[in-house]
């Protein structure tokens, strides 16, 4: 089964501001929903169900390949696009679920992913608001 899942939101910030937050998942991950991806080694991250390898993808702020499970083959990445209202942050998952993972993706992973990604976007907006509030206090 082919997988394609896209989330996007326009945030009133620069791509650089958002990229700095994306660089550290611990600061933006909704840990009340799921543990944040844990670094296993350089550019290798473990989640509760998957192992990701970070790689350089042209145009992406961060990009990952799914290394395991073998039945879930794909990539996911964050893109940042400057627009008049700020920046569009886009997260794309593209790949294929094989065998039992067709049902696991559809019934468990994708619904959880959707909730987690929207919460990540919420947390980015909250973190930016805190930064701006701190900047205001310094003036």
Q: Can you name each region flagged by the protein language model?
A:
Residues 1-41:
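Hydrophobic ligand-binding cavity/cleft-lining segments
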Residues 4-6, 47-51, 72-77:
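Short, surface-exposed coil-to-beta transition loops
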Residues 12-16, 55-59, 79-90:
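A short, structured loop/turn motif at beta-sheet edges
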Residues 18-29, 53, 62-64, 89-91, ...:
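Hydrophobic pocket/interface hotspot
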Residues 35-38, 50-57, 80:
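Short, exposed beta-strand/loop patches in secreted or surface proteins that constitute
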Residues 40-47, 62-69:
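Short beta-strand segments that buttress and anchor functional surface loops
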Residues 67-122, 126, 131-136:
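Beta-strand/loop substructures that line and gate deep hydrophobic ligand-binding cavities in soluble
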């Amino acid at each position: 089964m082919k997988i394609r899942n896209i989330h996007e939101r326009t945030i009133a910030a620069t791509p650089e501001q958002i990229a700095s937050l994306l660089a550290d998942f611990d600061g933006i991950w909704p840990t009340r929903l799921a543990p944040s991806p844990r670094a296993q080694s350089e550019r290798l991250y473990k989640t509760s169900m998957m192992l990701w390898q970070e790689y350089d993808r042209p145009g992406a702020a961060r990009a990952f390949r799914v290394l395991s499970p073998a039945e879930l083959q794909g990539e996911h990445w964050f893109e940042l696009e400057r627009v008049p209202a700020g920046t569009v942050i886009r997260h794309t998952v593209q790949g294929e679920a094989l065998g039992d993972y067709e049902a696991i993706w559809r019934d468990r992973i994708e619904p959880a992913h959707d909730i987690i990604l929207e919460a990540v976007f919420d947390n980015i907006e909250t973190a930016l608001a805190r930064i701006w509030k701190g900047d205001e206090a310094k003036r």
